[in-house]
From Swiss-Prot:
<dbReference type="Pfam" id="PF06407">
    <property type="entry name" value="BDV_P40"/>
</dbReference>
<dbReference type="InterPro" id="IPR015969">
    <property type="entry name" value="P40_nucleoprot_sub1_BD-vir"/>
</dbReference>
<dbReference type="InterPro" id="IPR036260">
    <property type="entry name" value="P40_nucleoprot_sf_BD-vir"/>
</dbReference>
<feature type="region of interest" description="Disordered">
    <location>
        <begin position="48"/>
        <end position="70"/>
    </location>
</feature>
<protein>
    <recommendedName>
        <fullName>Endogenous Bornavirus-like nucleoprotein 2</fullName>
    </recommendedName>
</protein>
<dbReference type="InterPro" id="IPR009441">
    <property type="entry name" value="P40_nucleoprot_BD-vir"/>
</dbReference>
<comment type="function">
    <text>May act as an RNA-binding protein. The C-terminal region is highly homologous to the bornavirus nucleocapsid N protein that binds viral RNA and oligomerizes. The viral protein also possesses a nuclear import and a nuclear export signal. These 2 signals seem absent in EBLN-2 supporting an unrelated function in Human.</text>
</comment>
Amino acid sequence: MGYFLKLYAYVNSHSLFVWVCDRSYKRSFRPMILNKIKELSRNQFSTMSHLRKDSQPSSPGDDAMDRSGLPDLQGRFELSGKNRQYPLDALEPQPSIGDIKDIKKAAKSMLDPAHKSHFHPVTPSLVFLCFIFDGLHQALLSVGVSKRSNTVVGNENEERGTPYASRFKDMPNFIALEKSSVLRHCCDLLIGIAAGSSDKICTSSLQVQRRFKAMMASIGRLSHGESADLLISCNAESAIGWISSRPWVGELMFTLLFGDFESPLHKLRKSS
């Protein structure tokens, strides 16, 4: 009994649950645990062998067990290898961008916190980027970002091909403050990605606010530097981490840094 208690304590110290469920973890620790079993077995069976020598001759089977240093435990734990599976409603949301023809509706919908909460936390940021930068939607699809996503409504999952709210039957209009709020979120997001792990610039930090205010002043929306806060509760950190981990992040940032983009006031200036 002492042998099994020692073995249990040793294995449990390495998190038995993770060891069983994570195959890569299990493979890496298997030699260590096997060696520990052998070590404990040697200690136990050397003591037993000493007692047998004092009492009776050992049998060939006992000698074989002592030579291997590992008791024959095979067959005592005959497990099928199967595991209880998750139910069908366990699908997690994933980042998605919907269809290009609906991107304006999707961006307008993501301004609503209640609607946004049903989707993966990265989805609103991707939708806002696609709304701001023409051509980005197709580029994201080409690198594997999905159109469709599982949403969580109540305790049930449903698959959606579009992230916009059903109430928008017609194309919605954006007011200036909404557009500036989307720009602010994208500013937080892109500065966070560009800063990277070597320079911890937090989103909505003083450094980001200064740059955003300067941008708003340059396009004639000075007051929006303070008041464009409709998405202040929509933290970009999830999207920063997710995009930064993608293999295409370098190409995205290179394109944004060296691309030539028109001013957000281009249409207003042409009409005046």
